[in-house]
Amino acid sequence: MSGIVSRLSVLGKVWLGLAAGALALIVFGLAAPGSSLFFPLVSLWCNAALFALALLVLRRAGIELDLFHKAVLVGLWAAAVLYFYWTLGSRTFLYHWDYVNYILKQYHAEAAFAQNTGAGFRFLLDSITEDYTNFITLFTEFPFCLSGKTGDDYAFCQVFSVLPSLLVLLVGLTVKVGRMLRVKNRFWYFLIGFSWCATFPFVRMSAVLGQPDWFGLIFAFMLMLLTLDYRFDGIDLPRYLLIFAATAGIILTRRWYLYFVVGYCFAYVLLLVVSSVRLAKSGQQSRAVHRMVRLVVFGLCAAGAMVLLLLPMVRKILSFDYAGRYSYYNFGGITLELAAQTLRIGLLNFILIGMGLWFAAKRRLPALPCLAGTELLVSLVLFTRVQNTGSHQMLLFVPGWLLLFLVGSAALADGLKKHTAVKLCYWGFTMVFAVSVRCSPLTTVALPGFVVDHFPLKAVSEFVRLDKLTYDRTDAAQIQRVDDWIDAHCDAEK
């Protein structure tokens, strides 16, 4: 037995350890139902399994991280810990409305598992048709269980439960895109591309406000890593299973991520059709036909299995009037949404995107910009048929925008021989600007806090006042006294 284990790869040993851990959890759950340790241990196992799955996706995608990549990854994660600690500690934010939903779900999940193991898992499964599923609570319980269990604690704990897997996959995506674009200056490309994407304000916006919806980006990055350069030239069952798992994971995170899935799949199929037509014209008709046959067979099988797996959700989607339910949030349609996207992305990012489009056109590498643009357009059109986006729903567009940022980073890195100081200053200024952006419920334009507080236009002075008051409450003590009085003098049963 020891000889078999010794011959396993490191990743194989990790999966063996996870299997042993799962077995131990099953025994523990049966032996001690209702134990306060069971749910945190399940959460710890889920986080370990998710990280191992991320590493498995990297391996299947042909990505190997060297010491430089790992050092930058660890350094940026450490910087993120400091950023969250400082940001959450320098404000007084009251978690309410949408911003308290996940925290309450975490409390309810803990209470359900405190009853017994079956009640806990039943609580998780019963939410599959809801707007906010309980899927994420499996991963955020640890290390939230070790904290003071406040709203700020919940936001901070995401740095340990969500961010590691997210950053590992973002590193892999950065390397993958650089390889596809045949970047020459790989050192600067990786530094610029990875840091640019990781500091994009709308990646972390919802997390800072207590909404762990960025968890879905983990599965979005998995899907992109597994498909960006895959053309169905051969049968790859492990890859198919991973694609299916990533798609199911992103749908279970938040239902509106379905718009990204539909948009990305449409763009990917369109890209594959175009490449197959070009193959056929070059005399490789048989190869082109086999590509399309494999794609159609996989697509039909995956769609059928997904419908069966998520049948309650599918029934809810088909029978529910979402346009009527969310009409309150449909405040301008696609015209206003395009304006909102423009303001959120900002001039600095659009300059980078423009450089990337020129770079791709000059090198005759249109696939990635076209894929990202098509995905963004389809997702945008479909989503605005129901409602307009808030800051957290911006996450469903983030993968497409990040893909365009990476193409622009390739252009910036390979063009450093000219105007080096100017380009590095542009990158550095953008990083400082992005990290300084205020993450507020009222954020419309991604601007640093000191810019928002001293915005020169009098027409928006009231909006600025409300934004500052919402982000950093000065009346928290008064609200607490009112709450204490209600608790002391009012009977909840009456």
What are these regions (language model features)?
Residues M1-Y85, R294-F298:
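Start-transfer (signal-anchor) and selected internal transmembrane alpha helices
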Residues G3, A49-R59, L166-K176, V269-L279, ...:
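Hydrophobic, aromatic-rich transmembrane alpha-helices
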Residues G3, K70-L73, F187-L191, L241-A245, ...:
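Signature aromatic-anchored transmembrane alpha helix within multi-pass, membrane-resident enzymes
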Residues G89-V100, A114-T137, V159-F160:
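Membrane-proximal lumenal/periplasmic loop motifs of glycosylation machinery
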Residues F156-K184, M222:
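Transmembrane-helix motifs of polytopic, lipid-linked glycan transferases
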Residues M205-F215:
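Short acidic/glycine- and proline-prone juxtamembrane loop motifs at membrane-interface regions
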Residues Y257-L258, A267-V277, R291-G333, Q341-L352, ...:
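Membrane-lumen/periplasm interface segments of specific transmembrane helices
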Residues T430-K494:
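Membrane-embedded, lumen/periplasm-facing catalytic core of multi-pass transferases
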